[in-house]
């Protein structure tokens, strides 16, 4: 698998490519299946439909890896938190966590056993996927998941989380530790179900100041990665902490690929990290609105990463109103332009 080879810094015939949120709303085929499912969470829980939408970008765009269709918040959902998705405001937890008693009500022993719909989707997708295409499993970072559990929804300033971080850091560490133990088991089950690689999304990394990022986020991601790498050395682990270009000097640990978001200069990440890790990223998603912008962006990134281990991706998820034709053009351009 070209994607897996690139993760391990092995030579590849061209630069492999996939896109975050590639199974998503820009595809009419996805919208059709989502309509049949009824709503987003029902689609996540219907393993046949989740598998179908995971495979769509492979069939339509010929990307080099599929990522399983799911959501990072199915983990706290199965730990016992009441999750719903509100139109216009995204995920909502009706009973956010603010005390140790709230945390102790959550089931960390059986949560990973209740996520069979994710494992079934992985099994089915791996069966249907051609042998040269990789299947990526994923989870959110403990910090990013915790922000939703504590805030009760998305947040602009993470005031409740940060209040806890500075007033009651022990409680926040307990929440993060509980999540970390569940996520280890969850990812292990994903690997057993057929995931060839794992990505940990730390979408809200940039909410933390320098030293707090390493204490409350990065160290927990490394604990998960160390667990996976000790048991499954052939499974690459990708870390994607978004928006931390100022923190790259302290990035170190046992993982394989570092995801670079579009706000981080790729040459900076290359100079600081490419001797240790394959880099993934980092085209500005809005370039996909225009073919000239795509061409310019692709050329720039391929030049920056020449002779370095690289997986092409966007620097964040593809947007819902990107024309499919432009997405196809982007994928093909990367594969053809980077051919050795």
Swiss-Prot record:
| Pfam families assigned to the protein according to its UniProt record, in alphabetical order | URO-D
Q: Which SUPFAM superfamilies match?
A: UROD/MetE-like
What is the main EC category here? lyase
Localisation: Cytoplasm
Catalytic reaction equation(s) = uroporphyrinogen III + 4 H(+) = coproporphyrinogen III + 4 CO2
Where is it predominantly found? Answer: cytoplasm
Q: What does this protein do?
A: Catalyzes the decarboxylation of four acetate groups of uroporphyrinogen-III to yield coproporphyrinogen-III.
As for family, the record states:
Belongs to the uroporphyrinogen decarboxylase family.
Q: How does it assemble?
A: Homodimer.
Q: What name does UniProt use for this protein?
A: Uroporphyrinogen decarboxylase
Please give the organism: Campylobacter jejuni (strain RM1221)
**Gene label:** hemE
